[in-house]
């Protein structure tokens, strides 16, 4: 961000913030859709039955753990690239 004016830095930060929010909302929407499609199949009541509730909890937990692990791996690879080394495991 060197070489940018203060106004340009603020604009860049604002754009990055909007992009991150959009990506978060997309991820959240996909999570809701996937877990709903996989877990909810009884539409005879207005509430979730206990089996569906448990399935959704496991689905969300699994998705969050997978996302966290992927994020860790990306950070590891990014750090290795920044140090000029090769990607881990190569």
Swiss-Prot record:
A motif (Twin CX3C motif) lies at residues 35-59. It is found in: Mitochondrion inner membrane. One of its GO terms (molecular function) is metal ion binding. It comes from the Eukaryota. GO terms for biological process: protein insertion into mitochondrial inner membrane. It is a peripheral membrane protein. GO terms for cellular component: mitochondrial inner membrane. It holds the Pfam family zf-Tim10_DDP. The keyword Transit peptide does not apply. The keyword Nucleotide-binding does not apply. Keywords: Chaperone, Disulfide bond, Membrane, Metal-binding, Mitochondrion, Mitochondrion inner membrane, Protein transport, Translocation, Transport, Zinc. Disulfide bonds join 35-59, 39-55. Mitochondrial intermembrane chaperone that participates in the import and insertion of multi-pass transmembrane proteins into the mitochondrial inner membrane. Also required for the transfer of beta-barrel precursors from the TOM complex to the sorting and assembly machinery (SAM complex) of the outer membrane. Acts as a chaperone-like protein that protects the hydrophobic precursors from aggregation and guide them through the mitochondrial intermembrane space. Heterohexamer; composed of 3 copies of TIM9 and 3 copies of TIM10, named soluble 70 kDa complex. Associates with the TIM22 complex, whose core is composed of TIM22 and TIM54. Interacts with the transmembrane regions of multi-pass transmembrane proteins in transit. Belongs to the small Tim family. PANTHER family: MITOCHONDRIAL IMPORT INNER MEMBRANE TRANSLOCASE SUBUNIT TIM9B. The twin CX3C motif contains 4 conserved Cys residues that form 2 disulfide bonds in the mitochondrial intermembrane space. However, during the transit of TIM9 from cytoplasm into mitochondrion, the Cys residues probably coordinate zinc, thereby preventing folding and allowing its transfer across mitochondrial outer membrane. This is Mitochondrial import inner membrane translocase subunit tim9. It comes from Aspergillus fumigatus (strain ATCC MYA-4609 / CBS 101355 / FGSC A1100 / Af293). The gene is tim9.
């Amino acid at each position: 961000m060197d070489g940018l004016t203060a106004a340009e830095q603020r604009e860049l930060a604002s754009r990055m913030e909007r992009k991150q929010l959009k990506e978060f909302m997309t991820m959240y929407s996909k999570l809701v859709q996937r877990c709903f499609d996989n877990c909810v199949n009884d539409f005879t009541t207005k509430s979730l039955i206990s089996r569906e509730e448990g399935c959704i909890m496991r689905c969300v937990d699994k998705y969050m753990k997978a996302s966290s692990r992927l994020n860790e791996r990306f950070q590891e690879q990014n750090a290795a690239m920044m140090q000029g080394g090769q990607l881990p495991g190569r």
